[in-house]
């Protein structure tokens, strides 16, 4: 089982063993895909390699997808169409983000979304991260107010 913590300092474990990716963009791709579930290759390139030309961005994305596959030991992300990347629904994933947003588990929120996580020179990712962090914090505060 893949366990991913995103609602505090992020962490990833696979069958209880901590997972460490060799570069931050691999972590970022995993986190983004867990939130979005599917994205076009162009969207991912624009998000993580916005300063690269298209060919270099595509090469970097392929390399990062391979790195995720190698590190996780399987196809967590699939590309059913040449232009699309999706999370493989056959994987068993426990993620605090899903518990909070989809299952309404108030206790899953233990801190800011991807607290302390950053990717150098990925301004689009940073913007997405800030928007998502703010949205989740507002949801948390709203639920907290409902309990009062």
Give residue spans per PLM region:
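DNA-binding patch around the recognition helix
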Residues: 1-5, 61-90
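Short, Lys/Arg-enriched N-terminal segment that forms or immediately precedes the first helix
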Residues: 6-18
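Ca2+-coordinating acidic residues in Ca2+-binding motifs
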Residues: 43, 60, 99
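Short capping segments at the starts of secondary-structure elements
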Residues: 32-44
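DNA-recognition element of transcription regulators
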Residues: 22-31, 54-73
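Intrinsically disordered, charged and Pro/Gly-enriched terminal/linker segments
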Residues: 17-21, 25-27, 35, 52-56, ...
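DNA-recognition alpha helix
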Residues: 43-52
């Amino acid at each position: 089982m893949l366990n991913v913590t995103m609602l505090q300092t992020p962490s990833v474990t696979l069958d209880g063993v901590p997972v460490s990716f060799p570069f931050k963009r691999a972590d970022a791709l995993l986190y983004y895909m867990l939130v979005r579930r599917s994205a076009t290759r162009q969207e991912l390139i624009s998000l993580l390699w916005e300063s690269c030309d298209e060919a270099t961005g595509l090469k970097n994305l392929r390399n990062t997808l391979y790195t995720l596959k190698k590190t996780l030991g399987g196809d967590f992300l699939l590309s059913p169409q040449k232009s699309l990347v999706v999370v493989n629904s056959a994987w068993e994933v426990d993620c605090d983000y899903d518990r909070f947003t989809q299952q309404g588990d108030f206790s899953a929120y233990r801190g800011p979304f991807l607290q302390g996580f950053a990717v150098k020179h990925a301004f689009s990712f940073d913007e997405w991260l800030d928007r998502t962090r703010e949205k989740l914090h507002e949801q948390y505060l709203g639920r907290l107010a409902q309990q009062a």
